[in-house]
């Protein structure tokens, strides 16, 4: 297992309709993503726990791209990965933000 941590300055304030947003299913062989409100002085943090070692540069690229598209303020993102491709990671991250902004459980 490998743990990767990232921090980005956020610009977009969001309101959580409930305590957290969870998308994906780890048992599916992909990943699960949890978004939680957190007092981070306007930042967004991302912690990735992955079974695939040695892909830090790929994760950095995917997460940096996400942070440019969605610079969320005071949000903690936790990703539990079981070998998802970068495209699936991006899709799930966008799904999590869409779910958060829609305020609907999925």
UniProtKB/Swiss-Prot annotation:
The keyword Transmembrane does not apply. GO terms for cellular component: cytoplasm. It is found in: Cytoplasm. Covalently binds the prosthetic group of malonate decarboxylase. The keyword Phosphoprotein applies. The modification O-(phosphoribosyl dephospho-coenzyme A)serine is found at residue 28. Pfam families: ACP. GO terms for molecular function: acyl carrier activity. Keywords: Cytoplasm, Phosphoprotein. HAMAP family: Malonate_deCO2ase_dsu. Subunit of malonate decarboxylase, it is an acyl carrier protein to which acetyl and malonyl thioester residues are bound via a 2'-(5''-phosphoribosyl)-3'-dephospho-CoA prosthetic group and turn over during the catalytic mechanism. Belongs to the MdcC family. This is Malonate decarboxylase acyl carrier protein. It comes from Stenotrophomonas maltophilia (strain K279a).
